[in-house]
């Protein structure tokens, strides 16, 4: 399942994303962040982090550098093992 999700993200990056203007306020982009998160934490945790990131990607947030965290947290500072 992980390989399928990663392939779908790459498909989006190569064929869909170039058709629209860049809108992501973060580095790496939201799709790359989600790709890295799925690769690092697995499908469910990675997609959860990607979903949280996409919700933050709007004009109400500052944007900037936002790498995938080293550890998985649902709420900042509260680790879920």
Curated annotation (Swiss-Prot):
Record function comment: Could be involved in insertion of integral membrane proteins into the membrane.
Family matches, as PANTHER family: MEMBRANE PROTEIN INSERTION EFFICIENCY FACTOR-RELATED
Its membrane topology: Peripheral membrane protein
Main localization category: membrane
InterPro entries according to UniProt: Membr_insert_effic_factor_YidD (IPR002696)
Subcellular location(s) of the protein: Cell inner membrane
Species this chain originates from: Thermosipho melanesiensis (strain DSM 12029 / CIP 104789 / BI429)
The protein's name in its UniProt record: Putative membrane protein insertion efficiency factor
NCBIfam families registered for this protein in UniProt: membrane protein insertion efficiency factor YidD
One GO cellular component term: plasma membrane
Entry keyword Cell membrane: yes
Coiled coil region boundaries: none
Family: Belongs to the UPF0161 family.
Disulfide bonds: none
Record key words, sorted: Cell inner membrane, Cell membrane, Membrane
